[in-house]
Amino acid sequence: MNEISPPPKSKFSRRLPRSLGIIVQRNCHISDARFAGDYSLCIYLLKMREYYRWEKGLPLGASLSNEAVGRWVQQRERQWEQVESDPYEQLHMVGQRFDPFDNDGINRELLPRGLVYSGGYGRFCKPHFFLGRLLRTERCRGYTVLISANEYARDLTAPPAMTLGRTIFLRRESLRRVVWEKIEEWRWKRQNQAMTRALAGLDVEHELERVLERVTDRELTWIIRHEIGEIMAGEQLGDAWHDMLLTVARTPAEIFARAVRDQLADFLSTLPVLLECADTASIDFYFAGLHGMRKELCPTLVRAYQDWVDTGDLDELNSMLPAGKRHWLSVAHSALDLHRQHGDECAHYIEGLMKDSRM
């Protein structure tokens, strides 16, 4: 077994067995070693700077030494080379061994101790592992929501939320970091008018920490609604969707398919509640975060948002909800049909759906 350095001791809680934290972090390193090469160089370096900041426990706004980050990146890449071919380790607790994807079994032991763990698959079918302090547990529409605070182990990419079965894992520390990154991008470019409106009345320049706390707490609600939408979408698409994603992993077809499911989830859950609440700042923040493939797929939704900005009338956005649900469910089923028809060769055909799938 190859050795790899664990995170600093300061990352670990007194209630956490240090050996457990080391194993989880090791599995994170193995996953990163296998998948870090999937990012473009620019995205990779940005993610590594953020990862360095987290591992060193530095404040979000702290300036980073390029020289120090560079040395750390080189060291981390050497460590990844040592573990890339290693299998993921089982977790050892109370005399038992747990598969790293046995979330229910692991959390039965950890939740009473104020800890939470998740192991699941994200974009490009990359395994994501994390271990954190349990902030609170909620129930929402029959689903269990586990909200974490401080993170003791994580991988290069730290998704703020993940749904596994009927459990939603929401990582507040990661969400806070995402909010900060969006605000920082806006401060540099000042081109995102939706973000300008979302932050109106907040003193970003002088009270950044307070703004981060406020916006993060506000966005927790909508992250949960999106994850509930993911569950609802999964109930309509079935297990065949996961099989299809495995087939098209690491292709443009996967990016497209995930964007379609995100759209379906939002039309099923996020947008109906968001528009019903008519929370101006949250609506603006939602559209400020709409980018890439998802924005490209829904020009009509973006125009309806602009109509609301101009008139203050939500009718255009509300009128899109029924048609949006039908449209994205239809596109998702079309992708599944292509997978059934073409099997391992379906990626090319699914990519062909992109042009005619815009709404």
Q: Residue locations for each model-derived region?
A:
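N-terminal low-structure segments adjacent to metalloprotease catalytic domains
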Residues: 1-136, 207, 359
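Active-site scaffold of zinc-dependent metalloenzymes
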Residues: 150-217
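Long, well-structured alpha-helical subdomains associated
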Residues: 37, 58, 65-70, 74, ...
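Nucleotide/phosphate-binding site architecture used for ATP/NTP-dependent chemistry
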Residues: 120-159
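Active-site recognition of the HExxH zinc-binding catalytic motif
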Residues: 218-235
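Post-HExxH zinc-binding segment in Zn-dependent metallohydrolases
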Residues: 248-285
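Short, charged/polar micro-motifs that form catalytic or ligand-binding hotspots
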Residues: 210-222, 251-259
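Post-HEXXH active-site segment of zinc metalloproteases
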Residues: 3-13, 233-262
